[in-house]
């Protein structure tokens, strides 16, 4: 999938509230995709930092996009597990969310996601298992 196909996937496959995050493709390899998450007031809680729920949604979305990219297009799939560690708060600047496929089995795909702030510092780390449904 090229950048325009990834943009189309983001625009047509996900729920409206995920589209409202404003994720855009930043880069990709055969087994990974990096999405840019623009920092916006609507993503921050009272403490002024981006909510952890936003990082988890962006991480899950990035992994689905990385899998679709590796498969050459979207297939029905579901997240089986997503374990996230929040390492530092992000108050300002865009965030880069990189999903990397670690192992692809017949039905299960294992991956990890890193969320970096604008300075490249690791803000969150997640591991995930996704099941292909078709």
Positions of the model-derived regions?
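Terminal targeting signals and extreme-terminal segments of soluble enzymes
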Residues: 1-134
């Amino acid at each position: 999938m090229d950048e325009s196909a990834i943009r189309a996937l983001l625009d047509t496959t996900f729920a409206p509230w995920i589209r409202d995050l404003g994720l855009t493709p930043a880069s990709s390899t055969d087994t990974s995709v990096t999405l840019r998450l623009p920092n916006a007031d609507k993503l921050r809680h009272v403490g002024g930092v981006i909510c952890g729920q936003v990082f988890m949604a962006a991480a899950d979305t990035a992994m689905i996009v990385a899998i679709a990219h590796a498969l050459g297009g979207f297939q029905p799939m579901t997240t089986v597990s997503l374990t996230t560690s929040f390492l530092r708060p992000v108050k300002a600047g865009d965030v880069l969310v990189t999903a990397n496929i670690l192992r692809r089995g017949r039905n299960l795909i294992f991956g990890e996601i890193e969320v970096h702030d604008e300075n490249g510092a690791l803000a969150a780390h997640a591991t995930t298992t996704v099941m292909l449904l078709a």
